[in-house]
Amino acid sequence: MKLDGKVALVTGAGRGIGRAIAMKLASEGARVVVNDLDEGPAGETVAAIGEAGGEATAFAGSVTDPDFGERFVARALERYDGLDIIVNNAGYTWDNVIQKMTDEQFQAMLDVHVTAPFRILRAASEPIRRFAKAEAQAGREVFRKVVNISSVSGLGGNPGQVNYAAAKSAVIGMTKTLAKEWGRYKVNVNCVAFGFIRTRMTQPLTTERDASGREVVVGVQPALIEALETQMIPLGRLGTPEEAANGVYLFCTPESDYISGQVVTVGGGIVF
């Protein structure tokens, strides 16, 4: 297995794409620290990984908590004594046209999609540098992987998502910058921009509570899905969580050891 013995941290892995990512990495031998806002979904992912013969541990909590990054990284080090793969997947949308968008809506997207990954990566910097220096002194070249998640909205914009598009564009800038900073430590930092994937975010409109307990509308109009599948997506359908996870997995394999600072779209042919 290509990831045998690696330690992977995945945020937002209790359901949907995040769960598919965690299960894919575990199926290839990685030991996964599974994060979700709630203990239930995180535990369900861990149980599914265990049933499939993999190894994982749950770490519930909101990625927007100021100390989340430190605690998340500490859990990986305490449980598995390693840190090889980080996938910053957690997120959601809170759409509105700009004239109706509140400061709270705009800031919420920056908090979860930009500030949270920044804090996780900042917390990971000390152990990553420490491991890399020890490996260099021993004459070993060991690559680590960071995969940040952006969106086609961050690449080309999307009406009603000025907050989400701004945040996901920032993720790309963070990815490219960190690829330059961490190259000396043999860390590949790449980004996957998802198109329209069949998850609760593309289900018919409904309301859910976010990390702060606020009610937010999630999902899309059914007419949009029909238009996407018949007119906008060249491959003619939405993607599955498993197909989205495969894009992330590619950046976690040894085959990506000389690829860094790149953005790949997993969107069925949608390009900008």
Feature map (PLM): residue ranges:
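Canonical Rossmann dinucleotide-binding motif of NAD(H)/NADP(H)-dependent dehydrogenases/reductases
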Residues: 3-33
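Substrate-binding pocket helix/loop in short-chain dehydrogenase/reductase
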Residues: 97-98, 102-110, 229
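Active-site helix of classical SDR
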Residues: 121, 167, 175
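Residue(s) in the substrate-gating loop at a strand-loop-helix junction
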Residues: 151
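Short C-terminal tail/terminal secondary-structure segment
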Residues: 156, 247-249, 260-272
